[in-house]
Amino acid sequence: ATEDSGRTLGLDQKIAVNEKADQLKLEFSGTAYAHFAAAMKAKLAVEKGDLELAAEELQWSLDNGAEKATEIIIRLRLARVESARGNTELALEMIQGVDSGAHKSAYEEAKGDFYIQLGDSESAFTAYEAAVMSNESTSPVSRNILELKIGQVRPIENSAEFDGVNELAGDDDAMSEDIR
């Protein structure tokens, strides 16, 4: 976690954040503040490398009635945590069929990442293409990252294209023999 100035929180500050987050969850469990507190605790847990605690905090939020907009973000974060824990199939199941609204691009990109982890390049390509088509971000960096991912999994569409390339290469060899 960082402060607005970009400095990293110290250990004492992280402990204080966790204590306040626990208090918010306990005293105001039905509010958005409690869900944001759980998300912050999950973020701190990920930074510490405690993916189990991160998953518990995010699951708490889902189990305790997060509003739809918050639930969409929490579900995606939980799926990413589960994937990092090695539960990639579960992660994919968690986000399949979800009406992700304005977060469709992020969901599709995550699906692509999960498919890559499962060794399914074709499905990853389809998901990344869907992410680009629904990209709610105007950030060129975001779009460029998606384009790089697409380039890594783009299927070979037609082997005849490569035959044509080989024929051209053969012609080059013939031309170089004529020159000699």
Q: Where are the regions a protein language model picked out?
A:
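Conserved small-residue packing positions in alpha-helical repeats and bundles
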Residues: 1-5, 42, 79, 112, ...
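TPR/TPR-like (Sel1-like) alpha-helical repeat modules
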Residues: 100, 119-140, 151
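Short extracytoplasmic
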Residues: 1-32
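"A position-specific structural signal for the A-helix of alpha-solenoid helical repeats
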Residues: 40, 77, 110, 117, ...
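Alpha-helical linker/edge segments of TPR/alpha-solenoid repeat scaffolds
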Residues: 43-52, 80-91, 117-126, 150-169
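Alpha-helical adaptor scaffolds
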Residues: 14, 32-106
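Solenoid-like repeat scaffolds
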Residues: 22-30, 60-67, 96-102, 132-137, ...
